[in-house]
From Swiss-Prot:
Membrane topology: Multi-pass membrane protein
InterPro entries for the chain: GPCR_opsins, GPCR_Rhodpsn, GPCR_Rhodpsn_7TM, Opsin, Retinal_BS, Rhodopsin, Rhodopsin_N
Chief localization: membrane
Gene that specifies this protein: RHO
Species this protein is from: Anolis carolinensis
Protein name: Rhodopsin
Classification of source organism: Eukaryota, Metazoa, Chordata, Craniata, Vertebrata
Length: 352
């Protein structure tokens, strides 16, 4: 084996030289140079600096502006809450442990950090699924005269919590476990060891299929059908400038969403699956650290895509920051860009 396994940890380095130490008790500077740990801490600080304001502002602006309290925006708010979970309970912990060079908070802290990081990530991922399904049902109309209302939104939000807890909870209850990963400064599910006493392999397979492949498939299906529907509508109404604009806006949003999803999550999932299928092989600590930390940047990408690209949200944010005035003068224009398209007409194709 090219790693060192101990109680509640796995260090991706052989202990033949005797230098490997418990990542809960000693700095891990034999895995990487101190400046690399400092770079991770600086990166996490940047994510906190960007992620907290934009997600908190999303919640604050929605509470302040009644016109934003629409069923579809419940999902957007849930997305912001998920990102705040990641920022407050995951990023802050990882920043501090990176500054110290090891997971200073012990096994209990590792379980807490791993749980909230996984919970936040899964809540965000399943929120994207609910948004994709909502867009598909409203625009593609597989059910005629369907109106996405408050009840549907609350059901969607509840589903994101149920699915997130179904992924983040089992390692705390004895099905798999959370351990330090990569450079040992953040915690995640144990992909590294079979650990039969906690049925680790079955949980990783379950997590990969149910909580990664399934949502990815749903998102691609829904947005793929959405693009086809918009193109078909544009072909039937060649002279409709509104439809042409809707096609461009929806297509742009879909492309950005898909790219950001792939950039954030596929590297992490791919590396995790490789480690799981090649347990005991030789790979360095940075091999898992880079994709794991990069996946955390989804806390910034998501609100940019689903909120800042929406004129109504954007203008309300500007008005809040500018004490009720919009220096861009788009108040009236923004009113026409409806976030609540899912609650109104079923006869038009409308971008989110």
């Amino acid at each position: 084996m090219n790693g060192t396994e101990g109680q509640n940890f796995y260090v991706p380095m052989s202990n033949k030289t005797g230098v490997v130490r418990n990542p809960f008790e000693y700095p891990q500077y034999y895995l990487a140079d101190p400046w690399q740990f400092s770079a991770l801490a600086a990166y996490m600080f940047l994510l906190i600096l960007l992620g907290f304001p934009i997600n908190f502002l999303t919640l604050f602006v929605t509470i302040q502006h009644k016109k934003l309290r629409t069923p579809l925006n419940y999902i957007l708010l849930n997305l912001a809450v998920a990102n705040l979970f990641m920022v407050l309970m995951g990023f802050t912990t990882t920043m501090y442990t990176s500054m110290n060079g090891y997971f200073i908070f012990g096994t209990v802290g590792c379980n807490i950090e791993g749980f909230f990081a996984t919970l936040g990530g899964e809540m965000g991922l399943w929120s994207l699924v609910v948004l994709a399904v909502e867009r598909y049902v409203v625009i593609c109309k597989p059910m005629s005269n369907f109106r996405f209302g408050e009840t549907h939104a609350l059901i969607g939000v509840s589903c994101t919590w149920i699915m997130a807890l179904a992924c983040a909870g089992p390692p705390l209850l004895g099905w798999s476990r959370y351990i330090p990963e990569g450079m040992q400064c953040s915690c995640g599910v144990d992909y590294y060891t079979p650990t039969p006493e906690v049925h680790n392999e079955s949980f990783v397979i379950y997590m990969f299929l149910v909580h990664f492949v399934t949502p990815l498939t749903i998102i691609f299906f829904c947005y793929g059908r959405l693009v086809c529907t918009v193109k078909a509508a544009a072909a039937q109404q060649q002279e409709s400038a509104t439809t042409q604009k809707a096609e461009r806006e929806v297509t742009r949003m879909v492309v950005i969403m898909v790219i950001s999803f792939l950039v954030c999550w596929v590297p992490y999932a791919s590396v995790a699956f490789y480690i799981f299928t090649h347990q005991g092989s030789d790979f360095g600590p940075v091999f898992m650290t880079i994709p794991a930390f990069f996946a955390k940047s989804s806390a910034i990408y998501n609100p940019v895509i689903y909120i800042l690209m929406n004129k109504q949200f954007r203008n309300c944010m500007i008005m809040t920051l500018c004490c009720g005035k919009n220096p861009l003068g788009d108040e009236e224009t923004s009113a026409g860009t409806k976030t609540e398209t899912s609650t109104v007409s079923t006869s038009q194709v409308s971008p989110a």
